[in-house]
């Protein structure tokens, strides 16, 4: 079968126009930014303007609010994400005009084609690990191009055009499109049974990861987390070279003695029995020590000086919406985090509890009805490290409502499984007012979720600055 691919685009960059349907998406915008920096003409549409689209317009992109056939103008290729429906008017018009329509991952693969690429895949930790790899390679003077699924604080962007032949990308497994990629080095952080609406079962998901790992060339490398049973189960089926990392003594790269101290995580790293010394990252949670260990493994295999790795990880400024402090008022610290899967919630709350030793108040917004439905059982025990839990309605992300997969049903289920302080607040906008009377000086408030829960932190801080806390 012949694929719709635009090879001519990369020979005529100054004449070619690439149109993105869903330009404001975090994955789409990163590719668009790299293409703009390479000299391509970029246009795109989305349902509404955002900080992301405004940034791209300042860089030279043309933005259309709303999806219409006339937005295509002189597009040579149309790029879509898995969230774009087949009946989208721009997609329909492109097909009628015989303009190639390709998935986001295929355009990313075209950018990677002539590069030595590192791709980071896994259910959790992709964005942080991708950002760490890019940071370490940059510190080593290798100046990679990077396309990340989140805004890297030091870049204030999710993309960077480098001058070298190296590229670092985040590989999205959600719809199987990461199988378009052919990385030289592949990292797999973990595998959890998610995106079952696409894969159907865990075996099919694992098979996709096996195929991804076997796409590296004969001179390439896979870096696999041995602590994750679903990743370890892949090892007999991996035909290309791999190294493992984790806390197990069977791992090629091992960590020990994880220490959480406020916003810093420290650990000792080993390559087999050889000590590599202590490392620290300015991030909360043992899971970030594992992310850093994967980066150490890549750097060691690429012969990057160990001290460069140590220093750059210590200076790594993190990624937005990954335990990001939004502010402090009346002795209450407000933090925002993207965590929306039970594993992510569990790790983030455990890190917060261990690192700060303070009362943890959580406001959680479930993300997608399918995820809430499929992982309801796992969610019920994910909030044990919170002292007070507020749950709001599901952020649909375009999905149809599923009976029983609602925010109030989740709150009831968590309560039924033993949590003693759970409150359901239907409207996200009512959360700040609901939280305020429950807060005490010294509390850590954590807003969790991949939707618009991120707005609650600033709204709560504004309220705290104008309204005294209730007396005990």
From Swiss-Prot:
Signal peptide: none
GO MF assignments: ATP binding; UDP-N-acetylmuramate-L-alanine ligase activity
InterPro entries: Mur-like_cat_sf, Mur_ligase_C, Mur_ligase_C_dom_sf, Mur_ligase_cen, Mur_ligase_N, MurCDEF_pg_biosynth, UDP-N-AcMur_Ala_ligase_MurC
GO cellular component: cytoplasm
Alphabetized Gene3D superfamilies for the sequence: Mur ligase, C-terminal domain, Mur-like, catalytic domain, NAD(P)-binding Rossmann-like Domain
Main function: Cell wall formation.
Name listed for the protein in its UniProt record: UDP-N-acetylmuramate--L-alanine ligase
């Amino acid at each position: 079968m012949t694929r719709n691919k635009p090879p001519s685009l990369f020979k005529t960059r100054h004449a070619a126009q690439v149109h993105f349907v869903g330009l404001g998406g975090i994955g789409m915008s990163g590719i668009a930014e790299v293409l703009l920096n390479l000299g391509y003409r970029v246009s795109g549409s989305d349902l509404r303007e955002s900080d992301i689209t405004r940034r791209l317009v300042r860089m030279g992109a043309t933005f259309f609010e709303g999806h219409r056939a006339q937005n295509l103008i002189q597009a040579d290729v149309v790029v879509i994400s898995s969230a774009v429906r087949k009946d989208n008017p721009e997609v329909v018009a492109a097909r009628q005009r015989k303009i190639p329509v390709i998935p986001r991952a295929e355009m990313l693969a075209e950018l990677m084609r002539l590069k030595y690429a590192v791709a980071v895949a896994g259910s959790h930790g992709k964005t942080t690990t991708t950002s760490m790899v890019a940071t370490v390679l940059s510190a080593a003077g290798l100046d990679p191009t990077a396309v990340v699924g989140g805004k890297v604080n030091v870049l204030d962007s999710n993309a960077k055009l480098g001058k070298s032949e190296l590229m670092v990308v985040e590989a999205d497994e959600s719809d199987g499109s990461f199988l378009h990629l052919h990385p030289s080095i592949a990292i797999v952080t973990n595998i959890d049974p998610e995106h079952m609406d696409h894969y159907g079962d865990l075996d099919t998901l694992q098979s996709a990861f096996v195929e991804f790992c076997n796409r590296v060339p004969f001179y390439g490398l896979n870096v696999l987390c041995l602590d994750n049973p679903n990743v370890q189960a892949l090892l007999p089926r991996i035909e290309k070279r791999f190294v493992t990392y984790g806390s197990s003594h069977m791992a090629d790269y091992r960590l020990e003695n994880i220490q959480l101290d406020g916003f810093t995580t420290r650990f000792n790293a080993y390559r087999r029995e050889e000590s590599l010394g202590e490392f620290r990252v300015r991030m909360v949670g043992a899971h970030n020590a594992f992310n850093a260990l994967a980066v150490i493994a890549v750097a060691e295999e690429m012969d990057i000086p160990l001290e460069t790795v140590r220093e750059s990880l210590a200076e790594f400024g993190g990624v937005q919406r990954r335990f990001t402090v939004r502010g402090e008022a009346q002795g209450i610290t407000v933090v925002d985090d993207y965590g929306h899967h039970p594993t992510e919630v569990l790790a983030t709350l455990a890190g917060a509890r261990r690192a700060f030793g303070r009362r943890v108040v959580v406001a959680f917004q479930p993300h997608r009805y399918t995820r809430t439905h499929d992982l309801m059982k796992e969610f019920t025990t994910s909030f044990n490290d919170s002292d007070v839990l507020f749950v709001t309605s599901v952020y649909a992300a375009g999905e149809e409502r599923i009976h029983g997969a609602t925010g109030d049903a989740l709150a009831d289920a968590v309560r039924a499984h033993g949590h003693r302080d759970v409150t359901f607040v239907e409207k996200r906008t009512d959360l700040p007012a609901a939280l305020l009377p429950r807060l005490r000086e010294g509390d850590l408030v954590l807003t969790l979720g991949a939707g618009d829960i991120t707005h609650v932190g600033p709204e709560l801080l504004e309220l705290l600055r104008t309204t005294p806390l209730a007396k005990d």
